[in-house]
């Protein structure tokens, strides 16, 4: 346990940052799930709209160091590929 006041402050800051990061991470996952849901329903326009919003949130997560750039790029690429396959299946 922290004894010095500065160490106690660091513990408080860590707890605060952890909660904020979990909230942001959860929001990113929620937007990704919305895209997947629209893809499963077959709504091309709604899926594209959801992807653009999710892509924005994912890149904001990269900027805030919630997820790494390569991970974000991979998630966006895979979602885009699924939407592209919706158009091919016509």
From Swiss-Prot:
<dbReference type="InterPro" id="IPR002583">
    <property type="entry name" value="Ribosomal_bS20"/>
</dbReference>
<dbReference type="GO" id="GO:0006412">
    <property type="term" value="P:translation"/>
</dbReference>
<dbReference type="GO" id="GO:0015935">
    <property type="term" value="C:small ribosomal subunit"/>
</dbReference>
<dbReference type="Pfam" id="PF01649">
    <property type="entry name" value="Ribosomal_S20p"/>
</dbReference>
<protein>
    <recommendedName>
        <fullName>Small ribosomal subunit protein bS20</fullName>
    </recommendedName>
</protein>
<dbReference type="GO" id="GO:0003735">
    <property type="term" value="F:structural constituent of ribosome"/>
</dbReference>
<keyword id="KW-0689">Ribosomal protein</keyword>
<keyword id="KW-0694">RNA-binding</keyword>
<comment type="similarity">
    <text>Belongs to the bacterial ribosomal protein bS20 family.</text>
</comment>
<dbReference type="InterPro" id="IPR036510">
    <property type="entry name" value="Ribosomal_bS20_sf"/>
</dbReference>
<dbReference type="GO" id="GO:0070181">
    <property type="term" value="F:small ribosomal subunit rRNA binding"/>
</dbReference>
<keyword id="KW-0687">Ribonucleoprotein</keyword>
<comment type="function">
    <text>Binds directly to 16S ribosomal RNA.</text>
</comment>
<keyword id="KW-0699">rRNA-binding</keyword>
């Amino acid at each position: 346990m922290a004894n010095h006041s500065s160490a106690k402050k660091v513990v408080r800051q860590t707890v605060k940052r952890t909660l904020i990061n979990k909230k942001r991470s959860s929001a990113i996952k929620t937007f990704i799930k919305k895209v997947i849901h629209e893809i499963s329903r077959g709504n091309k326009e709604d899926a594209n709209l959801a992807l653009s919003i999710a892509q924005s949130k994912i890149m904001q997560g990269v900027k805030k160091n919630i997820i790494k750039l390569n991970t974000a790029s991979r998630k966006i690429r895979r979602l885009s590929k699924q939407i592209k396959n919706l158009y091919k299946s016509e």
